[in-house]
Regions:
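Hydrophobic alpha-helical transmembrane bundles of multi-pass membrane proteins
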Residues: 1-245
Length: 245
């Protein structure tokens, strides 16, 4: 299927690209509600309030840390390098970039927060709230931005030819690795296994609300439209819009 050749002004492309970043970012941010509901529905009733607090807190921490150091750690990296600069993000938008810097920061920040949301689900009922927040600051401010910059920021993985679309490795690989490390260090939920290694009855660990967890799954499904569609990073041409669709 071909497209008639069209000419779109830089200003129009700037507007549509920025709108794509913002609208997709809103959908990805809505996934935070999905994670919170899914986790809250699957943990025991006594842990629901802690799960909600952790999900609200990790997003707040991610926003602050990604503004303070995260964005420039990822995008301030020299070509083929390993780490950017420890400086706060500042908006320096121009039409030449093809999109608003602020919309790009927001879109990348919600990806960063999603990485920590992956960890939250694994560590549910395994970790206290303040150590969790401390790790959230480290992951969203340092670990994820550095690994993100290796490819999306033009770092050594990018120059080596590695490609990542929609964070299949950078988001889910980083989040999964951090979650696995946390699970290994912290161990199983207290009281889940007997001294001989056998699994105890699930009665004390019954899910608090399966309908709530189900609603969380549907919200996450909806959020993926922003996560994957927005990763086209452009909506200023027919080809770009077709790719988003």
């Amino acid at each position: 299927l071909g497209y008639a050749e069209t000419t779109v002004s830089a200003e129009v492309q700037y507007i549509f690209n920025t709108l794509l970043f913002l609208m997709s970012g809103f959908l990805v941010m809505w996934m935070a509600a999905g994670f919170a509901m899914l986790e809250s529905g699957l943990v025991t009733s006594k842990s629901v309030s802690a799960i909600c607090a952790k999900n609200i807190g990790l997003y707040s921490i991610a926003g602050v840390m990604f503004w303070l150091v995260g964005y420039n750690l990822a995008y301030g990296i020299p070509e083929g390098g390993y780490i950017g600069t420890f400086t706060p993000w500042s908006d320096a938008s121009s039409v030449d970039t093809g999109y608003s810097d602020g919309s790009d920061w927001f879109f990348q920040m919600v990806f960063c927060a999603t990485t920590m949301s992956i960890v939250s689900g694994t560590l549910a009922e395994r970790i206290k709230i303040w150590p969790f927040f401390l790790f959230a600051a480290i992951l969203t401010g340092i670990i994820y931005p550095i690994s993100m910059g290796w490819q999306w920021g033009g770092g050594w993985l990018s120059t080596a030819g590695f490609s990542d679309f929609a964070g299949s490795t950078l988001v889910h690989g980083a989040g999964g690795a951090a979650a696995l490390a946390g699970a290994i260090v912290l161990g199983a939920r207290s009281g889940r296994f007997s001294s001989s290694g056998g699994v105890k009855s699930m009665t004390p660990f019954a899910a608090s609300s399966i309908p709530l967890a189900t609603l969380g799954v549907f919200i996450l499904w909806m959020g993926w439209f922003g996560f994957n569609g927005g990763s086209q990073l452009a909506a200023g041409t027919l080809e770009d819009v077709s790719s988003v669709a």
